[in-house]
């Protein structure tokens, strides 16, 4: 049981600590920014604390927007809270998180301290190595929008002693949102984007986790995406309707299109990883999107030092995810190496073409600041510097040769254009015609539309 009282949770110190942790980027419907709230911070903290303890606090309606889903063409609806509401939710989250962490199942990996996607993937691999070869791969249909408020509050009622805390959480659950000028009531679900929502969603689905544990079932869950593993097909087929029946008690159901029973030798995708037999590799579509992101870094207007920061950040990200899945010197590993060379080479070419950096020596010094050791062996890194510069200079010289040829052609074209102009007599004898000058040319227009242009 969580025993701290509301007045122990909400004090000036917890408000100060939580304020430092909330995002300063977005504003809510009241349009009060982080910096504006900060201008009179002491008073705002005191007013917030008093409104909570007196029970007069009411959250602002949320601002509903849509953002791109990672690695997808789909949109995700999220709701933006005001700075004050985010602050209050952060205090609640910081207070409740540690208690609920002790109650959660260890096979739940999303939104938790010391848990991660990689750990979920490794746990899945462990179960497969234990010869649990039959997999029920599924997720919950429209999960975040389907959480039953009454049932969630009943769960909280059994865990939290001070009912004022539950009442406060209930306010956040019930607060609706505006999308443009339309108001949407919020009678079920948690707001995606709210600070409390990940914790509340885990609290709700922990009931399923405990049910699976009681049934002695192996599973790995990451939010609403999960796999259940069995030693034989019969057990998998038998258990599926049992799971569906249990989920009905939570007003949830499996998403039919994403639910299948398969043998590991036929493969399945979970958390962006393709499991086939005892092997695993990154889903190709996801990898290609990551490679495209890498190439886009070289196409930005960043200077070379800014490019180095961005490419190092990218390399750090793939080290913490992709390289923990992909085998060294596998096809996917070699693909990442190849595209890194192409990306950096293109940036060297653009920088050389812009005459910002002129010598190979300068480029080598800059290249040494890139974390090549994440993808390459130390012994081969110097060779990669040479390869990158060689490719870039080859492209630069080819492009320069093309431009020189184009200049010669343009010069000859202009010679003849001027000759024709000198031999031409311009007659303007029609109503609606006008004569003007534009870009070193006489331009004849008829009612504003260009009819003829002659260089001079």
Regions found by a protein language model. Give the residues of each.
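Short, mixed-charge aromatic SLiMs
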Residues: 110-121, 229-233, 338-349
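Short acidic (Asp/Glu) and glycine-rich catalytic loops that position anionic groups and cofactors
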Residues: 23-30, 71, 100-104, 134, ...
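Short, residue-level hotspots on alpha-helical faces of the histone-fold
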Residues: 86, 90, 94, 98, ...
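Conserved polymerase palm-domain catalytic core
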Residues: 51-52, 61, 65, 106-107, ...
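Long, highly charged amphipathic alpha-helices
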Residues: 47, 90-95, 123, 151, ...
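Active-site and adjacent loop segments of nucleotide-processing enzymes
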Residues: 269, 274-456
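Conserved two-metal-ion catalytic palm core of "right-hand" nucleic acid polymerases
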Residues: 1-161, 176-186, 192, 430-456
């Amino acid at each position: 049981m969580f025993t701290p009282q509301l007045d122990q949770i909400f004090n000036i110190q917890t408000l100060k600590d939580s304020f430092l942790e909330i995002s300063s980027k977005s504003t809510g419907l009241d349009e009060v920014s982080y910096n504006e709230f900060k201008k009179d911070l002491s008073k705002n903290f005191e007013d917030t604390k008093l409104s909570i303890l007196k029970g007069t606090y009411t959250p602002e309606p949320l601002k509903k927007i849509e953002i791109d889903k990672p690695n997808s063409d789909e949109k995700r609806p999220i709701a933006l809270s005001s700075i004050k509401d985010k602050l209050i939710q952060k205090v609640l989250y910081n207070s409740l998180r540690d208690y609920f962490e002790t109650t959660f199942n260890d096979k739940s990996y999303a939104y938790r301290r010391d848990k991660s996607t990689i750990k979920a993937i490794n746990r899945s691999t462990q179960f497969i190595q234990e010869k649990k070869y039959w997999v029920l791969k599924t997720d919950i249909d429209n999960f975040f929008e389907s959480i039953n408020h009454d049932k969630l509050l009943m769960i909280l009622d059994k865990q939290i002693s001070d009912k004022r805390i539950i009442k406060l959480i209930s306010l956040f659950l019930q607060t609706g949102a505006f999308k443009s000028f339309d108001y949407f009531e919020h009678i079920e679900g948690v707001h995606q984007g709210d600070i409390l929502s990940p914790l509340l969603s885990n609290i709700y689905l922990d009931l399923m986790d405990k049910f699976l544990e009681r049934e002695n079932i192996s599973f790995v869950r990451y939010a609403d995406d999960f796999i259940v593993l069995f030693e034989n097909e019969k057990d998998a087929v038998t258990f599926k309707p049992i799971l569906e029946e249990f989920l009905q008690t939570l007003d949830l159901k499996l998403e039919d299109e994403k639910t299948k029973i398969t043998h590991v030798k036929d493969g399945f995708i979970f958390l962006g990883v393709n499991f086939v037999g005892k092997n695993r590799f990154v889903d190709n579509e996801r990898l290609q999107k990551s490679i495209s992101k890498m190439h886009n870094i070289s196409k930005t207007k960043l200077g070379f030092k800014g490019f180095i920061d961005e490419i190092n950040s990218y390399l750090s990200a793939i080290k913490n995810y992709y390289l923990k899945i992909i085998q060294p010197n596998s096809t996917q590993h070699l693909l990442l190496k190849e595209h890194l060379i192409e990306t950096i080479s293109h940036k060297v070419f653009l920088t050389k073409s812009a005459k910002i950096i002129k010598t190979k020596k300068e480029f080598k010094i800059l290249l040494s600041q890139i974390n090549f050791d994440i993808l390459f062996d130390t012994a081969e890194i110097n060779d990669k510097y040479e390869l990158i510069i060689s490719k870039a200079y080859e492209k630069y010289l080819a492009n320069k040769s093309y431009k020189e040829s184009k200049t010669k052609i343009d010069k000859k074209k202009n010679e003849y254009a001027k000759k024709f102009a000198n031999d031409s007599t311009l007659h303007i004898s029609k109503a609606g015609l006008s004569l003007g000058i534009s870009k070193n040319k006489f331009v004849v227009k008829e009612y504003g539309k260009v009819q003829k242009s002659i260089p001079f």
